[in-house]
Amino acid sequence: MDLLKLNRSLQGPGPGSGSSLCRPGVSLLNSSSAGNLSCETPRIRGTGTRELELTIRITLYAVIFLMSVGGNVLIIVVLGLSRRLRTVTNAFLLSLAVSDLLLAVACMPFTLLPNLMGTFIFGTVICKAVSYLMGVSVSVSTLNLAAIALERYSAICRPLQARVWQTRSHAARVILATWLLSGLLMVPYPVYTVVQPVGPRILQCMHLWPSERVQQMWSVLLLILLFFIPGVVMAVAYGLISRELYLGLRFDGDNDSETQSRVRNQGGLPGGAAAPGPVHQNGGCRHVTSLTGEDSDGCYVQLPRSRLEMTTLTTPTTGPGPGPRPNQAKLLAKKRVVRMLLVIVLLFFVCWLPVYSANTWRAFDGPGARRALAGAPISFIHLLSYTSACANPLVYCFMHRRFRQACLDTCARCCPRPPRARPRPLPDEDPPTPSIASLSRLSYTTISTLGPG
């Protein structure tokens, strides 16, 4: 994907560079640098301003790179080791983590280092490989986001139909198709990527398209396939999910008020027991309105029979309890789901809309785009797109209670704490007398030896 082609500035001007840079059909892979050579008149900046801009840029690159690599590696390890998290949704999250990790590793170092050095020193093979892997990683990440949106829509709003095909084997086939489709779609990148001199001892890894018309068609194709279509799919799917959850929230609120009114009128159930809430259908979702957990999405909430009986016997209907009532807990869980869905769609558009807009602008108006975006603007636009690689782990996984617990379990397994040694009694002290709690853990034979006799 043309993430890194806009800024044509390099460190230090060289003779003859203007003709090569301004030739139609040439687009650079390097996006940003500390220098100011471009097809247009360079901007005059003070040395202090340039150094401050470079320091901020390097710091942001380093922070985003470390967060992306660390967060996605943690996701891969946790999802790979935890059997409880091997679900259909988490299979897509694992693929998303791999693509985000590939985006961080294949894009960011090869964007920052050539701009700091002023030339591309890695050769033609690395140039073509980086260009290809960059496009594949962005395509896979975007298609995975759309696949997750469709999977969650099916699971929440069409659960009966989804149970037929929503299996891990089907998810594996979809993920494989996503990677193969992305690999085929990005074949033009290594074909039209070259390392070309643009000045004395200055090389650039660039996309050299056959014509300006081809470049425009390619930019529009990527804009449609990797932004508009996935964006519409995500917006519609999460909009329908939010609507479904909102209807469930309103129904639960009305049902809760009706239940409280009935309890006040009837004086409560015998013995102060609470009856389980009604099961109702709402747009294809089967809602159990009184029993839920933190991770519930409001559909197919099923609890073990023993837990159901304990809840039925111990949940009071009158008087405030120490924690939220089951119905209130369900409402809170649904609100968290709605908030997370809104954050997902917002992050997608915020991170990717500037990049796709800038690439399309440059394809149709190169000089105007270079005048407006050369230097820091396009560099920070690309940093914003890289932010998605570290934002996805935070949104999709670290907001999930079970994943947080799995992270703690994995860390405890990898770094076990040494057993604490019990302090030995001093010579003039009596040994500690076993307590009732410790005696209860002993066998009958051990307890009998401590009795009178």
Curated annotation (Swiss-Prot):
Record key words, sorted: Cell membrane, Disulfide bond, G-protein coupled receptor, Glycoprotein, Lipoprotein, Membrane, Palmitate, Receptor, Transducer, Transmembrane, Transmembrane helix
SUPFAM superfamilies named among the record's database cross-references: Family A G protein-coupled receptor-like
Annotated spans, Disordered: 257-276
Family: Belongs to the G-protein coupled receptor 1 family.
GO cellular component terms listed in the entry, alphabetical order: intracellular membrane-bounded organelle; membrane; plasma membrane
Predominant location category: membrane
Cytoplasmic side: 80-87, 151-170, 243-339, 401-453
Protein name, per record: Gastrin/cholecystokinin type B receptor
Annotated source species: Mus musculus (Mouse)
